[in-house]
Regions:
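C-terminal helical "tail/cap" subdomain of flavin- and related membrane-associated enzymes
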Residues: 1-6, 68, 261, 302-303, ...
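Conserved N-terminal helical subregion
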Residues: 2-8, 50-189, 232-246, 372, ...
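Conserved mid-domain beta->alpha element of the FAD-binding
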Residues: 9-38, 157-158, 184, 214, ...
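Conserved N-terminal glycine-rich FAD pyrophosphate-binding loop of Rossmann-like flavoproteins
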Residues: 39-55
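Short helix-loop capping/hinge motifs at secondary-structure junctions, enriched
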Residues: 64, 190-197, 323
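Active-site substrate-recognition segment that forms the wall
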Residues: 79, 200-235, 245, 249-253, ...
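A short coil-to-beta-strand element that immediately follows conserved catalytic motifs
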Residues: 178-180, 197-201, 245, 257-273
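Amphipathic alpha-helix from the class-I
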Residues: 228-236, 257, 318-326
Length: 401
């Protein structure tokens, strides 16, 4: 059975959809990506890619592209909100690569998206294709697009985000859950912050009702920040709503001066309400399955949303190569069985970190800080189950290149 005997239509040209397509093409699978936007334009924000995802991207031939724009932090610092005290320093950099076999990166999201898109032949990526509906005929899936185009494929992969049309068609309408958090995000030219003498770190400042993350991206030219603050209610879901710098500064009044200095140096900030969805019991129906935020939208508090989407693509490719076009439904069930428990675990851990990061000063916070201090170097080693994972391995063997 050849690898090109099954045709795949991926709906959604974000990081997860493009990564899946790159993985499939490397394995000789016939795949096309359909993206509703007329151009691939990623929001101005940072993204963390841990070794469990970077090993896959390297294997797919992207290492040189990633090294051009990616920043490799030497450590992650957990810090106290008011006095800046480092509660824990966990090594990354060379130590993480030696331990897990692949590096930990920080990227501008646009740089990562561009690297993935450049790895696809232009004829495999179809822009301006908004999915209007689909029909699973049993032996194939027919896709209908708002521009009037129709496409037939053996498998439909819905990688179309938290507002997934494919998920809605499979399982009915469902509103995402507001998590009680909003985030101000921004990118600051690094030369504006030279007086702070920032190290090349992943920084997480934890305080009452919020936390503040910052790190270098774009080859060190920019500092990305995300300032998370708790709110009781919110209705809009958007990555692109403009925020007020003054509001972000007010939300973090009383925090360490470095926090205010980073926020205050930004030209513009965007406000992002954090929504997620309850974990699904299954992702696949017939010849249709889901990938990424479409099936496991999670808070960014484990820095695993994109990484898990990339893992999805590797595992789905491996399952399709193993089973081939003759047994698509079985391949999708295998993919789901391998991926759903891990993604659900990380959804739940990400939600738990909201409470852990936002503790008010008091006994629970003191217990958390004491525990962080005792772990040190061991905190990263404890994540071996996460960072050492190779999502392309099925039954102990690599199922594709």
């Amino acid at each position: 059975m050849s690898r090109d005997d099954v045709s795949i239509a991926v709906v959604g040209g974000g990081i997860g959809g493009l990564a899946a397509a790159v993985s499939m093409l490397r394995a000789g699978v016939d795949v096309h990506v359909f993206e509703q936007a007329p151009a691939l334009v990623e929001v101005g924000a940072g993204i963390q890619i841990s070794p469990n995802a970077s090993r896959l991207l390297h294997r797919w031939g992207l290492r040189a592209a990633l090294d051009r724009t990616g920043v490799r932090p030497v450590a992650v610092h957990q810090r106290r909100w008011d006095d800046g005290r480092t509660l824990q320093r966990a090594p990354l950099g060379e130590a993480a690569e030696a331990a897990f076999g692949a590096p930990y990166y920080h990227f501008h999201r646009g740089d990562l998206l561009e690297a993935l898109a450049d790895a696809l032949p232009p004829e495999r990526l179809h822009l301006g294709h908004r999915l209007a509906g689909f029909t699973d005929h049993g032996d194939r899936v027919e896709l209908r697009f708002a521009n009037g185009a129709t496409v037939s494929a053996d498998v439909l992969v819905g990688a179309d985000g938290i507002h997934s049309t494919v998920r809605g068609e499979l399982f009915g309408p469902e509103k995402p859950r507001f998590t009680g958090c909003i985030a101000y995000r921004g990118l600051v030219p690094a030369d504006r912050l030279g007086h702070l003498e920032l190290e090349v770190l992943a920084n997480n400042w934890m305080g009452p009702g919020g936390h503040f993350v910052h790190y270098f991206v774009a080859g060190g030219r920019l500092v990305n920040f995300v300032a998370i603050n708790e709110r009781e209610t919110w209705t809009r879901e958007s990555w692109t709503d403009r925020g007020e710098v003054a509001d972000a500064l007010a939300a973090f009044k009383g925090w360490h001066p470095q926090v205010g200095a980073i926020i205050g140096a930004v030209d513009e900030t965007f406000i992002w309400a954090l929504f997620d969805r309850a974990p699904l019991d299954h992702w696949s129906v017939g010849r249709v399955t889901l990938l990424g935020d479409a099936c496991h939208a999670m808070l960014p508090f484990m820095a695993q949303g994109a990484a898990q989407s990339i893992e999805n693509g590797a595992t789905l490719t491996a399952c399709l190569v193993r089973r081939g076009g003759a047994d698509v439904a079985s391949a999708l069930r295998r993919y789901e069985a391998l991926r759903l428990p891990r993604a659900t675990r990380l959804q739940e851990m990400s939600r738990a970190n909201k409470t852990r990061f936002h503790l008010p000063d008091g006994p629970a916070q003191q217990e958390r800080d004491a525990l962080l201090a005792t772990r040190g170097d061991r905190s990263i080693a404890a994540l071996g189950w996460l960072y050492s994972h190779d999502a392309s391995v099925i039954d102990g063997n690599h199922a594709h290149p």
